Amino acid sequence: ANVVEQYVQEIEERLIEETDYVKELANGVEALDVAQNHPRIVVPKYYPELSNQRILTMDWLEGISLNEFIKNETNQENRNIIGQALVDFFQDQVHSKKRFHADLHPGNFLIIDDLKLGVIDFGCSKSIDNEFYNQYFSLVKDDVLNDPIQLKKVFLKLDFLRETDTPEEEKMFTDVTVKIIELVSRPLRSESFDFGDEQFNEDLQKLGNEMNDNQDLKGDNSIRGSQHALFLHRAFIGLFGILYNLKSK
């Protein structure tokens, strides 16, 4: 299958899973387990004995919407606390369980009393295997990014490069991908990061515009990257969007 078909198949699989209550139940139970490590995260308790293919039973979480919190909360420290709780929970899911909430938008979060973050709707979750995980996250390491031979090996395994690429294509896609990685991974490579920094958001928009204007990045040949990265990228975009709106540090 070509890369477009692989992407379509990946999206189809996630959409089908969103209608599978048995799968969502398992995802929710696992997320509840991860939440035990995070005092500020609340995941509803699920009831397997009261659930089936058509019914999903869980506790009701009482709180205000994350959008309401973003709109009305004036204490930046409180905004930072919620942002940090979300980052810690997501990172734990990715790095410990290698299965994560892949639908990170404000509608799936509630602010509960005492500054706790309620997380709901685990219908869209994505699992990643060890091989993909190791290759993908090696790209935030300087010793990989700065080693052209090692970098090419990883890019080939992650489908950012193809064996059939011409030398010109290889250079172009390598340069573009490294530029994206260096910018987007900036928060992951920093001890602390201020998502209220407008410069980061401006840099993202500038890079997006540059890529959009680059005619060499049009067409099927420019669609690069493993299908397994699709929902991981979607999750990071959602995460960064929430953190930007919170102006979290």
Question: Where are the model-predicted features located?
Answer:
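Conserved ATP-binding subdomain of kinase catalytic cores across diverse folds
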Residues: 1-67, 81, 85, 96-97
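Residue-level signature of catalytic and energy-coupling elements of molecular machines
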Residues: 24, 57, 105, 121, ...
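Juxtamembrane "helix exit" motif at the C-terminal ends of alpha-helical transmembrane segments
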Residues: 33, 101, 244-246
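Helix-rich C-lobe and terminal helical cap/extension of kinase-like folds
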Residues: 52, 61-63, 68-85, 112-249
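Hydrophobic "anchor" residues on beta-strands that sit immediately upstream
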Residues: 55, 101, 117
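Conserved hydrophobic core/spine positions of the Hanks-type protein kinase catalytic domain
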Residues: 88-90
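Conserved catalytic-loop position in the HRD/HxD motif
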Residues: 98, 103-105
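Hydrophobic residue at the +6 position relative to the catalytic HRD Asp in the kinase catalytic loop
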Residues: 107-111
